Amino acid sequence: MYCSCNGLGCDLQGFLLHHWKFLFTFATRKIKMNFKQLVNRISGIYDEREASSIVKMLLEESFGLSFVDVCLGALDKLSEDETKSLEGMMLRLEKGEPVQYIIGRADFYGRQFAVEPGVLIPRPETEELVTWIKEESKDIRGNRNGKKYLLDVGCGSGCISVTLALEIPEAEVSAWDISDTALRVTKKNAKALGASVDIYMQDALNAPSGDRELWNVIVSNPPYICVKEAEDMERNVLEHEPHEALFVPDADPLLFYRAIAEYGTHALCRGGRLYFEINRAYGKETVKMLEMLGYHDIELRKDAFGNDRMIRACI
């Protein structure tokens, strides 16, 4: 490329190639961002209210900026490195990646849990299940030594097992999963939050047949979404959260519940209790399955949104 200016020739292409770093830096420094613009960038994925909450969380957790700070122009005062970091995070949000994975943590039961791709992000419904177990824990008989032994099957981030260990201090809590990532993240969260949890790699579908009256409580939030339901799921969940922790075959939606419940028939102590978070579409079927296995005092509860979501059964 060649241009002529006031009779002087200049090689524009050579100039751009030689000075591209300077020009790029100059351009990025001139970019101005405001809160509304950030929200608009992800409004095609989330509704405006949720998009606003996500951007607020991102700015607060990653840059220490409150909404008041942002309204007072704090975005314009970000350093060049911070601006680049924010832009990178926004690009990830635009691709549908959950904000919890981007900031590396999620709130659960008043605590912050480390999360990363490969473990499910804790949900509010699971907090309700934990509350139910905590409320009934005083009525659960311990073993001969007075201890109460709790098992979390499919621990994921450890949100259930770690929380129960902290909320029920007289309990000895163990956690199973088949994912190296899940076991590592659970261990990380237990250490960070000061909880004592024994962590094991164990497949729920191949639980030890020789276990006899080990546990006072078994709790699980296993995979329960049928493959056919995937088309109704949100993009950020479907494309980014681990499918092995979400889905079961359409032909056998109770696969994990049945396996864990069968294990519980011999691994739970007399008077022991089984707690499940369930697929809202299969509440009655899950109750019937538990009855057929000999469980009693079965209770099906709805979550805060009015959906069948939790079951407790006694043995």
What is the predicted function of each stretch?
Residues 125-232, 259:
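Conserved SAM/SAH cofactor-binding pocket of Class I
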Residues 250-313:
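Conserved Class I SAM-dependent methyltransferase catalytic core
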Residues 3-5, 10:
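Cysteine-centered motifs
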Residues 46, 137, 190, 264, ...:
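Conserved hydrophobic residues forming the short capping helix/wall of the S-adenosyl-L-methionine
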Residues 22-71, 75-78:
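Non-catalytic accessory regions of SAM-dependent methyltransferases
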Residues 224-256:
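Mobile active-site "lid"/loop adjacent to the S-adenosyl-L-methionine
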Residues 103, 201-202, 278, 302:
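Short loop/edge segments at beta-strand edges and connector loops
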Residues 60-136:
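Conserved AdoMet
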